[in-house]
Design a protein with these regions (language model features):
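Acidic/polar alpha-helix N-cap and adjacent early helical turns
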Residues: 306-316
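Active-site glycine-centered loops adjacent to acidic/histidine catalytic or metal-binding residues
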Residues: 74, 103, 125, 188, ...
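Conserved AMP-binding/adenylation subdomain of ANL enzymes
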Residues: 1-42, 56-57
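Conserved ATP/PPi-binding loop(s) of AMP-dependent carboxylate-activating enzymes
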Residues: 126-130, 142-175, 215
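Conserved beta-loop-beta connector loops within the AMP-binding
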Residues: 134-153, 176, 194-195, 258-264, ...
């Protein structure tokens, strides 16, 4: 199961006596027809759902003014995707902005949300009632000041008691701080602004260390997705003989667009002109699709495994 899908799309609405329309398996062709037939007031989904909506011509003439809430969660929503989705909603009659939340199954789904006045671009809002957030220096319990990036930690009544029969993993993520409370160390990087609004920037596990420099895949992905011909991008670390790892970008183009030398050069120049030298991808690969997990997230681990196998085969 997935905490976001159950908590936001099933449990929450049912507690409020709201009709819930269950879609057992997402079908891009049927989705526009379902939206037109049922006219839901709210939809919740992961970023790949918004990508599908943006690229689906079936939505060209559909009025979405019935929508009051569009909630994104389950995975990182890039700033460029957020901006594109907001334009899409307004051009289809929905005078709203996409809402974001943050949470994980270990904290029983959502722990923060972009309540009114906190839905700033790129933010994940403020803590939900009963929850507390702090930012710690990664791998420690040392709390950091406002504006400084570190590991997002959550404390509250919805945080799990632990992983069943996995004491070592439990001790690694549930840690007691100086305030005497037990905090969930999420493995995600972010910061809290002086006004209390929280920002998620990167999953700690996805960070690429290249020649001692920290390379953040989502920063590169967000930049490449700003190119008008790019639909989706995923960046992973690939083995390098002396830098240990370097970045490689996997790119999916929008419908009707094809890879060509001019486009490849434009994307390379975009990266060179806007990124630190150590963050610029060493390789670019264009694909028709990207692998997905069971929860429709981009499966970056599969891409990493593919690259690892390639490197190992070259060494033989």
């Amino acid at each position: 199961f997935h905490g976001f899908g159950l908590g936001v799309s099933v449990h929450g609405p049912l507690c409020l006596k709201v009709e819930t329309i269950l879609v057992p398996e997402f079908d891009g062709k049927r989705f526009p027809k379902m939206m037109k037939t049922y006219k839901p007031q709210a939809i919740a989904g992961v970023p790949t759902l918004w990508s599908a909506m943006l690229e689906n011509k079936g939505f060209d003439n559909i009025d979405l003014s019935n929508l009051k809430y569009v909630i994104s969660g389950g995975d990182y929503l890039t700033l460029s995707m957020e901006e594109r989705m907001n334009r899409f909603l307004r051009t289809h009659g929905a005078n709203i902005s996409i809402s974001k939340g943050y949470g994980m199954t270990e904290s029983t789904a959502a722990t923060s949300y972009t309540f009114s006045g906190t839905n700033e671009p790129g933010s994940i809002g403020i803590p939900m009632i009963g929850n507390k957030f702090c930012i710690c220096k990664p791998e420690t319990e040392e709390e950091l000041p406002f504006g400084e990036e570190g590991e997002i930690c959550v404390c509250g009544p919805t945080v799990m008691q632990g992983y069943l029969n996995r004491p070592e993993e439990t001790a690694n993520v549930l840690r007691k701080h100086k305030d005497g409370n037990t905090w969930l160390h999420t493995g995600d990087i972010g910061y809290i602004a002086p006004n209390g609004v929280i920002y998620f920037t990167q999953r700690l596990k996805r960070m690429i260390v290249s020649s001692g420099f920290n390379v953040y895949p989502n920063v590169i992905e967000e930049l490449i997705e700003k190119h008008p011909d790019v639909a989706k991008c995923c960046v992973v670390g690939i083995p390098h003989p002396y830098k240990v790892k370097v970045a490689k970008a996997f790119i999916v183009l929008k419908e009707g667009k094809e890879e060509n030398p001019k486009l490849r050069k434009e994307i390379k120049e975009l990266c060179k002109n806007n990124l630190e030298a150590f963050s610029v991808p060493r390789e670019y690969e264009f694909r028709d699709t990207l692998p997905k997990t069971l929860y429709s997230k981009v499966d970056y681990k599969q891409l990493e495994e593919e690259e690892k196998e390639k490197a190992e085969s070259k060494e033989k």
